[in-house]
Amino acid sequence: MNFEVILKEKYLENPCSFQPIALWKAIKMTSGFIKETKAVDNEVVNLIIENELMLHTYWLDSKYSIHPKVKDSYTMMILHDNFIEKFDVSNFSDEKYFKLIHNLKNVDKVELNNKFSFRTVNIQSELGLVSDIICKCYSDIRVTPEEVLDWTKEAVFDNSLWVLVVDNIKEMPIALGIAECDKDIMEGSLEWIQVLPEYRNYGIGVSLVNYLLWLLKERANFATVSGRVDNNTNPERLYRKCRFQGNDIWHILRKNSDEY
């Protein structure tokens, strides 16, 4: 069977425990990687995506016990919480991420204070605005207008899913939400939910997420979102307020520099 077909089937069985990010992004990221499967009685029980430096995907059917070997050449591994104990990760730093899912069947009503309003990003003229909002919301992330333009060239791009929240009095955008929709497997994903620091704790983030979910409800069968567990803004709490569910934890493991 074609590897990508197997990948999609396994992903749709449980999107949050099979990949830490949306499937389309994982497929793009691993173009050129080595892809392997092991089967028992024509049933896939083990799946690996790797290259010389990185173990991107490791999945094992819970009915089987296979003990993998960490290659000395790995400088990075991505492992679900279910599998991390199978690996010796003593020489790796560990950054934890959550991944949650929404069934899009029970989307809460959008409640936004009348001081604010939603509008769609103008892709022709507001790439700089998009990058500026993102940069103002992070101390460790810098996104250029050129990078934002590249996002619009992906097959999952849908301009109607790029949404700004505007302060009606100041007539200025104060929050940004970007979602994507993979029509191949009917997956929606939230990629950027950013509220300027001075406008946080007013419920704007919840309103923005619910607004995007209502848009995705007409396009997708489910929606996913990922984020860092130790983020000071606690995005997981925001998404759970909007009925995202799940308990999947992913580990982004990077080999300590003195071990290279």
Where are these predicted regions, by residue range?
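Conserved active-site tyrosine of GNAT-family acetyltransferases
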Residues: 84-89, 235-240, 244
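Cytosolic beta-strand hydrophobic patch enriched in CBS
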Residues: 34-40, 162-167, 225
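Conserved donor-binding loop and adjoining core beta-sheet/short helix segment
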Residues: 8, 14, 18-71, 174-197
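Conserved acetyl-CoA-binding loop-helix of GNAT-fold acetyltransferases
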Residues: 62-71, 192-197, 201-217, 236-241
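Conserved GNAT acetyl-CoA-binding A-motif
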Residues: 71-81, 216-228
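Short amphipathic alpha-helix that is part of the acyltransferase structural core
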Residues: 1-24, 111-143
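A conserved beta-strand-loop-helix scaffold within acyl/acetyltransferase catalytic domains
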Residues: 49-51, 140-195
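Acyl-donor-binding surface of acyltransferase catalytic domains
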Residues: 44-115, 251-255
